[in-house]
Curated annotation (Swiss-Prot):
InterPro entries: P-loop_NTPase (IPR027417), SNF2_N (IPR000330). It holds the Pfam family SNF2-rel_dom. Keywords: ATP-binding, Hydrolase, Nucleotide-binding, Transcription. The keyword ATP-binding applies. The lineage of its organism: Viruses, Varidnaviria, Bamfordvirae, Nucleocytoviricota, Pokkesviricetes. It comes from the Viruses. Its EC number is 3.6.1.15. It comes from Swinepox virus (strain Kasza). Belongs to the helicase family. NPH I subfamily. It catalyses: a ribonucleoside 5'-triphosphate + H2O = a ribonucleoside 5'-diphosphate + phosphate + H(+). It is an enzyme of class 3 (hydrolase). Residues 42-89 form the Helicase ATP-binding domain. ATP binds at residues 55-62. This is Nucleoside triphosphatase I. GO terms for molecular function: ATP binding; ribonucleoside triphosphate phosphatase activity.
Length: 89
């Protein structure tokens, strides 16, 4: 990782440091530290506008994405968001 990217990730984490790690639904869901890190980095982006998540089955990619989308919906209230996932995860 270049020093530019490392500094940018540090900046993103500072921008989102007050962001909660819980998602209120019927039952409250708390993100694991690595999920919260990914969400913080993505939500702190202002120059890079995409993020590719890949990892093994069962590590929480869908819940991390749902958390990011819920945070974006709070920021951009006029957005319509459509999330497509497989029926069986």
């Amino acid at each position: 990782m270049s020093s530019y990217h490392a500094a940018y990730i540090d900046y993103e984490l500072r921008v989102t440091e007050s962001m909660t790690d819980t998602m209120g639904t019927d039952t409250e869901i708390t993100l694991k530290p690595y999920q919260h890190f990914v969400a913080s980095v993505f939500l702190g982006l202002d120059k890079m506008h995409s993020l590719l998540l890949f990892h093994d089955t069962g590590v929480g990619k869908t819940i991390t994405t749902t958390f990011i989308i819920k945070q974006l919906k709070n920021i951009y209230t006029n957005w319509s968001i459509l999330l497509l996932v497989k029926k069986h995860l």
